[in-house]
Structures are given as C-alpha cells and as structure tokens.
A protein has these predicted regions:
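Nudix hydrolase/Nudix homology domain
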Residues: 24-27, 64, 76, 105-179
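Acidic, metal-coordinating catalytic segment for phosphate/diphosphate chemistry
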Residues: 2-40, 44-46
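Short, well-ordered strand-loop elements centered on a beta-strand within folded domains, enriched
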Residues: 19-22, 48-54, 134-139
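The catalytic Nudix box helix
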Residues: 52, 69-103, 125
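Hydrophobic alpha-helical segments and helix-packing faces
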Residues: 34, 59, 63, 67, ...
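Short gly/pro-enriched beta-turn/loop segments at secondary-structure junctions
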Residues: 36, 94-96, 120
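Residues immediately flanking
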Residues: 15, 55, 152
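A glycine-rich, hydrophobic loop/mini-helix early in the fold
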Residues: 38-71
Length: 179
C-alpha cells in the first residue's frame, strides 16, 4: 500500500473546484489537508442491497470504520466515472454493469480524532451489478478489512441514528441523497 500511495497522484483543487496541481497521495492527508478530487461509490446488487465495506486497519484516514462500497481519487486527467470503475475492480474485484452520477458536486471536510483531515470534492456514484455478483467480492486486504451486503434502508437508518458507526463522508452523503 505504501508504495502504491507514494506513486499515486491526487488532483488538488482551488476553491472553485478547478484543478490546481497534484500531490502524492502519501503526502496529501494530514492536519491541513488541501481540497482535492475524490469519488465515492455505492454498489447495489439486483435485490437492492448495498455492499458496505470496513476500511482496512492500516488506512491513513478512518481505519477500521464501516463505509460505502468504494472510495478513491481520480488520477490527473482521469474521468471520475472511469476512476470509480477502476477502483471497484482494484478494491473489490467487481465490475459494475451500470454506473450513475448521483451527487456531482458533493464536497466535505472532516477531522478525525487523531487530527487527520479529509477535505474532498467527491462526486458520488451509484453502481449496480445485475444478479448476484459472480465472482463474489474479492477485496484487497490493504483497502478492505470486511464487507457485507445490507438493505439500503438499514444503511440509511444507521447513518441517521448511529452516525459514529460510519465514515463521516458516507453519513453526509446519505443525508444528501434522496430516500
């Protein structure tokens, strides 16, 4: 993970959301994290269940926390939708049948208990796999500690009644999404 993060570039953004440079991913997250481009994906099966993941314990931000299906950063010049599909494959071993942008301008800033800041312009996607995913998810252990399929209504309920149990971005995203 450290090697991949050191090589991966994150797109920095100005206050208007325009690209303003790049920074190695390994250096971007700290106590004064600059605004940068990311994305979030909520992956559903044909029964309407959401794939939730528990972040790996070695993650720099919010280790061990339950969250949406997949998150990541588009590379310089990479379309966020293409990056979302790429990361679903890398993190979960899955390829979506459909992908839809549902919150194009979502932006948030969150401070973890250890002072590490996330500050992202984070387009949010819904993705679907038709039928039961074959093969089932095969998560990258450097990214995902655990996973399960849950009803969307249950995830929304947890985000509302026990927000401390989820990543701060997923709580804010769920609040911004239609019921």
């Amino acid at each position: 993970m450290a090697t991949r993060a050191a090589e991966e570039l994150v797109v920095l953004l100005d206050e208007g959301g325009r690209p303003a440079g790049t920074m190695p991913k390994a250096e971007v997250h700290g106590t004064d994290t600059p605004l940068h481009l990311a994305f979030s994906v909520y992956l559903f099966d044909s029964g309407g269940r959401l794939l939730v993941t528990r972040r790996a314990l070695q993650k720099r931000t919010w280790p061990g926390v339950w969250t949406n299906s997949c998150c990541g950063h588009p590379g310089p010049g990479e379309d966020p939708a293409a990056a979302a599909e790429r990361r679903l494959g890398q993190e979960l071993g899955l390829r979506p049948d459909r992908l839809e942008l549902v919150l194009p301008e979502f932006t948030y800033r969150a401070v973890a208990a250890d002072g590490i800041v996330e500050h992202e312009r984070c387009p949010v996607f819904f993705a679907w796999v038709d039928g039961d995913p074959e093969p089932p998810p095969t998560p990258d252990p450097e990214e995902v500690a655990d996973w399960r399929w849950v009803p969307w209504a249950s995830f929304r309920a947890v985000a509302t009644t026990a927000p401390w149990a989820l990543s701060p971005w997923s709580v804010e995203q769920v609040a911004a999404l239609p019921a």
